[in-house]
């Protein structure tokens, strides 16, 4: 049986750390940043962990 392909959209959006946690970027950090406070853009630049409820599904997509 051939290997399953990983979901290309999910592989761009999520990454697995060395300890197995799945990390994602925060929203609202792509464009129209001029009027957003610097404090907010700094806060949004930190990656966050995916919730455990979604982690199982994402792990399946990543293969």
Curated annotation (Swiss-Prot):
GO BP term, example: translation
Listed InterPro entries: Ribosomal_bL35, Ribosomal_bL35-like, Ribosomal_bL35_CS, Ribosomal_bL35_sf
The entry's cellular-component GO terms read: cytosolic large ribosomal subunit
Task: Give UniProt keywords alphabetically.
Answer: Ribonucleoprotein, Ribosomal protein
Q: Does the keyword Ribonucleoprotein apply?
A: yes
On the tree of life, the source organism's domain of life is: Bacteria
The GO molecular function terms of this record are: structural constituent of ribosome
Q: Answer yes or no on keyword Cell wall biogenesis/degradation.
A: no
Q: What is the similarity comment for this entry?
A: Belongs to the bacterial ribosomal protein bL35 family.
In terms of HAMAP family, this protein maps to: Ribosomal_bL35
What is this protein identified as? Large ribosomal subunit protein bL35
**What organism is the protein native to?**
Thermobifida fusca (strain YX)
Q: What is the lineage of its organism?
A: Bacteria, Bacillati, Actinomycetota, Actinomycetes, Streptosporangiales
Name the gene that codes for it: rpmI
């Amino acid at each position: 049986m051939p290997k399953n392909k990983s979901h290309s959209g999910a592989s761009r959006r999520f990454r697995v750390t060395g300890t197995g946690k799945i990390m994602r970027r925060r929203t609202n950090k792509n464009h129209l940043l001029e009027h957003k406070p610097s404090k907010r853009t700094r806060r949004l630049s930190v990656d966050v962990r995916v919730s455990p409820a979604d982690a199982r599904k994402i792990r399946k997509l990543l293969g």
